[in-house]
Amino acid sequence: MDWSHRAFPYSISGTQHAAYQDCIVKFGHESMWQAAIDIDEYPFSPTDQQPKFAQRKVASFSKAMPIASELSMQNFLFLGKPLDSNEHPLLIDRLWRRTHGPANALVKPIYKPSHVARAAVHHNALSKGNSVNFPVTELRMNHYWGARLQNWGDDTPEILGKTQPDTSMETIVKNLKDCITHCLPSVDLVYRKEWS
């Protein structure tokens, strides 16, 4: 959902909290679970890359943890020197190095909208239930954060030391490219250099 009209001036409460709260208010009644993720964040399962993997992981984990109202995806940063954007227009096809483990505590939630008292970026204020971390072996967040805060650039010794090669998104990238080429009337619907 586009929230760019609230992006300038940017503030956590005026932009992100407000966007997530608005999503709960407008669409929270449409599903049992909802996710609050940004355009550079991708849920990823090391064990399941088939369509609807996130739904299956949420159903399975929430059944095992019935007290959970919020399931947190831990944050794995993808960093380093990106491949050329003209040859690799999809962001997830430009970076193939990630942090060894969760990079920080900046998780992103999948939550029951009916159990959220107030939306927040990393952990909602819950009216009932608990927040539980997904095991990273089941579901994590691949975060292509570098352009914003890490200044993507050359693979320096520092970047190489805190990252490892990760090609686990190859199947997803291939499927997306195939679909973009064969499922859409024009690749321009996906590959845009700037927002209008």
Regions found by a protein language model. Give the residues of each.
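Short, solvent-exposed loop/turn segments at secondary-structure junctions
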Residues: 40-42, 76-79, 140, 146-149
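Active-site-proximal specificity loops/subdomain of glycosyltransferases
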Residues: 1-36, 44-45, 49-50
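Hydrophobic/aromatic beta-strand patches that form the interior of the parallel beta-sheet core
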Residues: 35, 69-71, 139-142
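Extracellular/periplasmic catalytic domains that process cell-envelope and extracellular macromolecules
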Residues: 27-29, 64-65, 132-135
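C-terminal catalytic/acceptor-binding lobe
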Residues: 87-196
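Intrinsically disordered, low-complexity acidic segments that are enriched in bulky aromatics
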Residues: 1-3, 67-78, 82-84, 90, ...
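Conserved donor-nucleotide/metal-binding helix-loop-beta segment in metal-dependent transferases, i.e.
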Residues: 45-81
